[in-house]
């Protein structure tokens, strides 16, 4: 398929560190987080309206829907996994939350970053060191798996900036990004046990001319990955079986943070970007950094996002 048929449209205002898009097929709405501004935001693509819930608890790294519950979300805020009571229909300044469990309990300088729910309703989320003067201490993070017992289990440690994750539709492969490595790795996946094994590098940016580091990612029904490049101005499309770069799509922001498919047929790729800590020059050249963009005409379809299964 040729590049020129792809349209890239801005669908929200520019926010701060927009990240972690999660498509809710039930409501046809897109949730995402604005990490440092401490908001969960919800876009209604039909109207363009964005509603926001302020999370006083701390920076919000990730948000997912909860199974069979229209007005509850689960998010990672600071080092806590929290239950958020919000139906998304209006702005909320005093959002009600409940702490479900905590991770990195032996550390105090880390926070939850990206995460996703697997086919059995378990929440996988990872941590990273807090940014200090633009720097993140290496090897302070961990990737965890949390089921309905709310007891975090360690899957990968140490990592530096735990980021994108995806499972293939056959549910026997798990893909993962620790951003500073500039690699996407694949594992064999056991969906019953929720365990991973046999790590293998499936794409290495260090062996390409691509700029930036891999950040968030998603997978399509063909089993190919879509990866956001933070500092790289692009979303890349990668075949994890061959390690081949299939194509790249330029985004009007340098720091592209994450991607997910949405829309009734899961054919629109929603792309989050960051407007956080930009120089005056960057703001001038990319005034819409921090916005969400919608890519259409890619000729690919996504896989439904899972919701967290809780004992309620």
Language model features: what each stretch is:
Residues 182-183, 204-244:
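Loop/turn-rich, solvent-exposed surfaces of beta-rich toroidal or solenoidal domains
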